[in-house]
Amino acid sequence: MKFFAAAALFIAGVLAAPSPNAANSVTPLCNPGLYSNAQCCAVDVLGVADLNCATPPGVVNNAAEFQAACAKIGQEARCCVLPVLGQDVLCETPLGL
C-alpha cells in the first residue's frame, strides 16, 4: 500500500513538471510553406508586390519582436513567397499580428 502511494506521488510530480522544450519554444513568424520568408518591406502594392524589402535586423523570436524590429527601421513586417533583389512577390501579414 505504501509503495503504491509513493509511486503515485512520484508519477504525479513527474507529470506536473514542465517540459524543458516548453520554455524555449519559438512561435513561427510566418506560415510554413509558400509565405515562409520573413521580410521588412517599405511599400506594399495590394499584397501582390512589396518594395524595398530586407530580412529583419537582429534576432526576432515572435511576431511582436518582428513588428518592432521592422518598425525601428521604418518598414512593415511581411511574410512573402519570393524575395528577389529587394522586391518581394505575394506577401501577407505575419502570424499573430
Swiss-Prot record:
Its main location: secreted. The keyword Transcription regulation does not apply. It is found in: Secreted; Secreted, Cell wall. The keyword Nucleotide-binding does not apply. Keywords: Cell wall, Disulfide bond, Secreted, Signal. Transmembrane segments: none annotated. Belongs to the cerato-ulmin hydrophobin family. This is Class II hydrophobin 3. The gene is HFB2-3.
